[in-house]
Regions:
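Bacterial N-terminal signal peptides that target proteins for export
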Residues: 1-8
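C-terminal motif of bacterial Sec signal peptides marking the signal peptidase cleavage site
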Residues: 15-18
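Bacterial signal peptide processing site
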Residues: 20-24
């Protein structure tokens, strides 16, 4: 079934109004006189907890053994790790064994952990195997001038409308999606889906937002045909939910900065604007109603902020993880 985000916001509010415990008559009687729409069912086993660790999970070989042991023993249902099989690391070929090891370990509520691979589709990363000597912004043409908003050196915005870039992402054994499938991941986390908001990207392609929706849909169609049940988790990009192609393509969303953000100079604890949080929660509720589980990563370095984020996320039905900006190790703030 095709939905628009506006329809979903209304439908989820209608269902909540019919089921909710507010007093007063007013609109309550009118809502209850109609049969509320039923929430859709997610297309995959939804974890109760997850952790994201994007550094030092195999790319350094034996030096990362303790980190991998810690991930295997940690009581999380799902793990989001970098797909080192697509990196230039000398240990790239160990990725499948690492995924297998993590799969074999138990989660907090699942007998075996789910493992998702990190794939950046909106930026070119200079440490990936596809990056060639001599590449620089403008050469090749799809690598655009600009810096990563989070301050990570060597990451560049891309014109993702480029067939060459899209071929790097999926469609051949060496592509990012194909490697993730071959290495045994349960799915992928698509980062920088919001690449359509970058000024250099808009200058190169004024229809960047629609192009990204088509791009994600093409990735999902390809991946699910190659590995049925492969899960597509998309980063942020709530605006794309008004596009039915995108909404049908993604299985879940991961929203960053729901309660606390970070910057290039601050690892976390930047309180999100309350109006922004309220709007995010409304839109994310609609996505959950459409059968799209919502994950969230908030960036905090204090116990008080971590506890606040976990408590508020749980009350909103959001699967939360709190860590610092680097995501370089398991957080010391485990979910309660």
């Amino acid at each position: 079934m095709r939905f628009s985000l506006a329809t979903l916001v209304f439908a989820s509010a209608l269902a909540l109004g019919a089921c909710g415990g507010g007093g007063g008559s007013g609109s309550g009687g009118a809502v209850s006189s109609a049969s509320p729409a039923a929430a859709a069912t997610p297309d995959f086993t939804v974890p109760r907890t997850f952790a994201a660790v994007l550094q030092n999970v195999g790319e350094n070989g034996p030096a990362d053994a303790a980190r991998i042991d810690a991930l295997a023993s940690a009581p999380y249902d799902a793990l989001l790790i970098d797909e080192i099989g697509t990196s230039s690391s000398a240990y790239a070929s160990t990725q499948a064994a690492i995924v297998s090891r993590l799969h074999a370990s138990a989660g907090s509520s699942l007998a075996h952990k789910l493992v998702f691979g990190y794939v950046d589709i909106g930026e070119a990363e200079s440490f990936r195997a596809y990056w060639q000597v001599g590449w620089t912004p403008g050469t090749p043409s799809f690598v655009l001038s600009g810096t990563d908003p989070n301050g990570f050196a060597g990451d560049y915005p891309v014109n993702f409308a480029s067939p060459t870039w899209q071929a790097i992402v999926f469609g051949s054994p060496a592509s990012l999606i194909d490697r993730a499938i071959a290495d045994g991941f349960d799915g992928v986390y698509l980062d920088w889906v919001t690449g359509y908001t970058f000024a250099p990207v808009i200058a190169a392609n004024p229809n960047a937002q629609a192009t990204m929706a088509s791009f994600v849909a093409a990735i999902a169609t390809y991946a699910k045909a190659k590995k049925p049940g492969f899960t597509i988790v998309a980063q942020n990009a709530r605006e794309l939910s008004t596009d039915s192609r995108y909404l049908e393509a993604v299985d879940a969303v991961l929203q960053e900065d729901l309660f606390f953000s970070n910057s290039a100079t601050q690892a976390g604890d930047i309180a999100q604007n309350s109006a922004v949080t309220s709007q995010l929660l409304t839109e994310l509720s609609a996505l959950r109603f459409a059968g799209k589980p919502v994950f969230s990563i908030d960036y905090a370095t204090t116990s008080a902020n971590a506890t606040s984020a976990y408590t508020r996320a749980r009350s909103a039905g959001v699967i939360e993880y709190v860590s610092d900006r680097a995501l370089g190790a398991l957080s010391s703030f485990a979910p309660p």
